[in-house]
Swiss-Prot record:
Complexes and interactors: Component of the mitochondrial ribosome small subunit (28S) which comprises a 12S rRNA and about 30 distinct proteins.
Record lineage: Eukaryota, Metazoa, Chordata, Craniata, Vertebrata
Keywords: Mitochondrion, Ribonucleoprotein, Ribosomal protein, Transit peptide
Annotated organism of origin: Bos taurus (Bovine)
Full protein name: Small ribosomal subunit protein uS9m
One Gene Ontology cellular component: mitochondrial inner membrane
Top-level taxonomic group: Eukaryota
Length: 396
């Protein structure tokens, strides 16, 4: 049987062209031939050339590790801040060794007075750690592999913390089951006392973890901590929960309550000052009386003809159920009738604090009786009829 014939006129030139292409590609190291050669037959069969991409053996680790603010950058900024603070202290005639941040702020306000309403737009000179945000250090090695197994979750610190908290929950539940099996478990020791403290808010937790969290993530974490705090905890678990609690100071304790004073007749009295808008008031509240109130030597019914102003004066006594038990003498100046009534009410409320308990003082603070009203009259705007009112627009 005769061998199959091959048309050399067409096959040879193409074979030479392909051989040259394969040999050139082998030199470049980019192409590989999957067979030893070309097959001859009725039709020339050409094997497909496979492309294998070149693998980069050296990685630009510096580019992968690029940080917004490096450690060297922060150190340089701190050095410049310390030098600038010493120069500022010398300019103000102060001792550079005892020049505090409060002195720096006061000096900047004096040297660079600004009338800008937005405080963030005013000139400042703060420590670099307060100016530049915290950032996470590099989380992978020279080979490009991350150190933490939760790196690819995008929130490795958050999920690691959730794992740790849930592990403590399981440990506390196991200990609770053991106590219940021995008959030593009591409901009184079930929960941890959290009075006087609060959980970290979302922004504080983000600053601690140096990660952005969603509201759902934050709520889930707080629910897990509340579940842990409801279980009988040992010292280590209480310390873990305490890391995410902040002590809340009772606001009423910040107010300085003056002790009671006594006059020549031995009657107890207390004084208080109040202010609202441009009105200033001073009140003297006596311990025993019939409910008589004098303002600048005039009875309050004659001084304030408007019922609303009278109700403002009587509200502190009505709130404490002390109507008709105290006599009050007030002096007030400046402002209008409404602002004078507010200033007198604040002065009387502060004076009453000397006659009541700490709990009642806290109730008054929560009711707003011990808080100064910061509202003032809004200034007129140029090009307008008033603070908000515009001129009447006329087409013609």
């Amino acid at each position: 049987m005769a061998a199959p014939s091959v048309s050399c006129g067409a096959a040879v030139p193409y074979r030479l062209f392909l051989a040259g292409r394969v040999s050139f590609a082998r030199e470049q190291g980019l192409w590989k031939a999957a067979a030893s050669g070309l097959q001859t037959g009725t039709r020339c069969q050409i094997l497909r050339l496979k492309h294998s991409p070149a693998v980069t053996t050296t990685k630009n680790v510096a580019a992968l590790r690029r940080e917004s603010y490096t450690v060297d950058f922060i150190k340089k900024q701190i050095e410049e801040f310390n030098i600038g603070k010493r120069h500022l202290a010398n300019m103000m005639g102060e001792d550079p060794e005892t020049f505090t941040q409060e002195d720096v702020d006061r000096a900047i306000t004096y040297l660079f007075p600004s009338g800008l309403f937005e405080k963030r737009a005013r000139p400042i000179m703060k420590h670099p750690e307060e100016i530049f945000p915290k950032q996470r250090a590099v989380q992978w090695g020279e080979d490009g592999r991350p150190f933490h197994f939760l790196f690819y979750t995008g929130k490795q610190s958050y999920y690691s913390l959730m794992h740790e908290a849930y592990g403590k929950v399981l440990h506390a539940e196991e200990r609770q089951d053991q106590l219940r099996a021995k008959g030593l478990f009591s409901e009184k020791s079930k929960s941890k006392d959290l009075i006087g403290s609060r959980w970290l808010i979302k922004e504080e937790l983000e600053e601690m973890l140096v990660e952005k969290l969603s509201d759902q993530d934050y709520a889930q974490f707080i629910r897990l901590l509340e579940r842990l705090s409801a279980l009988p905890c040992d010292a280590a678990e209480e310390e873990f929960v305490g890391r995410f609690r902040r002590t809340v100071t009772v606001q009423s304790k910040k107010h300085l309550i003056e002790p009671l004073q006594y006059d020549e007749q031995g009657m107890a009295f207390s004084t208080g000052q109040g202010k609202r808008k441009t009105a200033n008031a001073e009140a003297v509240v006596y311990g025993h009386g019939s409910g008589k109130i004098e303002i600048n030597g005039v009875d309050y019914l004659l001084y304030f003809p408007v019922t609303q102003d009278r109700e403002q004066l009587m509200f502190p006594f009505h709130f404490l159920d002390r109507l008709g038990k105290h006599d009050v003498t007030c002096t007030v100046s400046g402002g209008g009738r409404s602002s004078q009534a507010g200033a007198i009410r604040l002065a009387m409320s502060r004076a009453l604090c000397s006659f009541i308990t700490e709990d009642e003082v806290e109730w008054m603070r929560q009711a707003g009786l011990l808080t100064t009203d910061p509202r003032v009259r809004e200034r007129k705007k140029p090009g307008q009829e008033g603070a908000r009112r515009k001129f009447t627009w006329k087409k013609r």
